[in-house]
Curated annotation (Swiss-Prot):
Keywords: Antibiotic resistance, Cell inner membrane, Cell membrane, Glycosyltransferase, Lipid A biosynthesis, Lipid biosynthesis, Lipid metabolism, Lipopolysaccharide biosynthesis, Membrane, Transferase, Transmembrane, Transmembrane helix. Its EC number is 2.4.2.53. Belongs to the glycosyltransferase 2 family. GO terms for molecular function: phosphotransferase activity, for other substituted phosphate groups; undecaprenyl-phosphate 4-deoxy-4-formamido-L-arabinose transferase activity. SUPFAM superfamilies: Nucleotide-diphospho-sugar transferases. GO terms for cellular component: plasma membrane. Pathway: Glycolipid biosynthesis; 4-amino-4-deoxy-alpha-L-arabinose undecaprenyl phosphate biosynthesis; 4-amino-4-deoxy-alpha-L-arabinose undecaprenyl phosphate from UDP-4-deoxy-4-formamido-beta-L-arabinose and undecaprenyl phosphate: step 1/2; Bacterial outer membrane biogenesis; lipopolysaccharide biosynthesis. It is an enzyme of class 2 (transferase). The chain crosses the membrane at residues 233-253, 268-288. This is Undecaprenyl-phosphate 4-deoxy-4-formamido-L-arabinose transferase. Catalyzes the transfer of 4-deoxy-4-formamido-L-arabinose from UDP to undecaprenyl phosphate. The modified arabinose is attached to lipid A and is required for resistance to polymyxin and cationic antimicrobial peptides. It is found in: Cell inner membrane.
Length: 327
């Protein structure tokens, strides 16, 4: 066993989770105390409109809890909030966890144990998943499309309960693209990975922040920001459509010659239908190209992916000790 882990950071993005926060903090603290190593909990408020930021500030003011509250000025999205937490984290292993308590914080010590065996990334698979049938089907579809498009073989990309070694986190922080999906990005740099089954519970507090439209947008973002496979597929489809159009044109010319101009006039609507199909395919292609160009434009502007409005912490022994060692 390779155990070079001196300390652990836990990063939790929070968005409108005031109902679950007291229980989340209590259970996460209890889990971290079982690690047997110095630890810190970084709670990132992603522009919540409820009392989440207030509760995080209150928790971070207690020096006994080892909590750092990072407050973003507005909502930037789950993965940007996690990157903000990574920027604050100093642990040799960094654990990410959702705030909805569907994945129990009690799994944290087990993830640290696997990371201590030398794995760069410890992924998780939700066993006996308690989501609705729609969410399960949507998740399976997204996972399948990601695996086929990116070539990154993972069973459950949607589960954010994961462990990352320090060098993986550092590598991700050097990536400045605006659209980021952390599990895939981490696997890009990881040499040794593993996936383990973890428990999954029903959501007790609040509602899911991922609606149907957000899931569709997420799938589209993943396919366009992480791979050029859609462009290659589009080129293949364009070639097939062009060849089909050429063959159809030859067929129409032949039928006109053998059956006369009268038949050709009666086939105008068929021709229009085929034309509209080709025009529709062109618009789909233009939209996809526009999405890629828009992402290039966004990345070229190099605007920050988030803005930290305030950081609150009453106890920072982990950060202080690490900085002293580096100096």
């Amino acid at each position: 066993m390779i155990d070079d882990i001196k300390n652990v950071s836990v990063v939790i993005p929070v968005y409108n989770e005031e109902e679950s926060l007291p229980v989340l903090i209590e259970r996460t603290l209890a889990a971290c105390r079982q690690i047997g190593k110095p630890w810190e909990i970084i709670l990132v408020d992603d522009g919540s409109s409820d009392r989440s930021a207030e509760l995080l500030t209150e928790a971070a003011s207690d020096p006994e809890k080892h909590i750092i509250a990072v407050l973003l000025n507005r909502n930037y999205g789950q993965h940007s909030a996690i990157m903000a937490g990574f920027q604050q984290a100093v642990g040799d292993v960094v654990i990410t966890l959702d705030a909805d308590l569907q994945n129990p914080p009690e799994e944290i010590p087990r993830l640290v144990e696997y990371a201590a065996q030398g794995y760069d990334v410890v992924g998780t698979v939700r066993a006996n998943r308690q989501d609705s049938l729609f969410r399960k089907l949507a998740s399976k579809t997204i996972n399948m499309m990601i695996r086929r498009s990116t070539g990154k073989s993972m069973a459950d990309y949607g589960c954010m309960l994961r462990a990352y070694r320090r060098h993986i986190v550092s590598a991700m922080l050097h990536c400045h693209e605006r659209s980021t999906f952390i599990p895939i990005l981490a696997n890009t740099f990881a040499r040794k990975t593993i996936e383990i089954d973890v428990m999954h519970a029903e959501r007790e507090f609040g509602t899911s922040k991922y609606s149907f439209l957000k899931l569709i947008n997420l799938m589209y973002d993943l396919l366009t920001c992480l791979t050029t496979t859609p462009l290659r597929i589009l080129s293949l489809i364009g070639s097939v459509v062009a060849l089909s159009g050429f063959l159809l044109a030859l067929l129409l010319i032949g039928l006109r010659l053998f059956l006369g101009a009268e038949w050709a006039a009666e086939g105008v609507f068929t021709l229009f239908a085929v034309l509209f199909m080709f025009i529709g395919a062109q618009f789909v292609g233009m939209g996809l190209l526009g999405e890629y160009i828009g992402r290039i434009y966004t990345d070229v502007r190099a605007r920050p992916r988030y803005f930290v409005q305030k950081t609150v912490s009453a106890a920072t022994p982990l950060t202080t000790s690490l900085r002293d060692e580096e100096e």
